[in-house]
Amino acid sequence: MKPFQLTVKAKSDLKDIALFTSRRWGREQRNIYLKQFNESFWLLAENPDIGKTCDEVRDGYRKFPQGSHVIFYQQIGSQNIQIIRILHKSMDVNLMLGE
């Protein structure tokens, strides 16, 4: 079992990012970017405190930059994290996470 899980919205975010990247820069770049996200997920799972706290957005949430995006996550239990959303850095975080 992976030490991280993605919410339905995070999976949708990742799918949208993959589609946009593939259309804009091609499959090879899409694969590189998705691999970088996967590596970040594992890094966060192994070091959950590495991300910056963002309690102003939601209590218990942390954020971690990945390319042009920001991964929002929270620790669940002692050895797992939940990826909440993956948002472009230009998005209105309060609006997107307030859903």
Predicted regions and their residues:
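Basic/aromatic recognition patch in beta-strand/loop cores that engages polyanionic ligands
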Residues: 38, 49-78
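Arg/Lys-rich, positively charged N-terminal/basic patches that mediate binding to nucleic acids
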Residues: 1-34
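Short proline/glycine- and basic residue-enriched helix-capping loop/turn segments at helix->loop/beta transitions
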Residues: 45-46
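Enriched for short, Lys/Arg-rich terminal
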Residues: 74-99
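Generic alpha-helical structural context detector
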Residues: 19, 39-42, 85
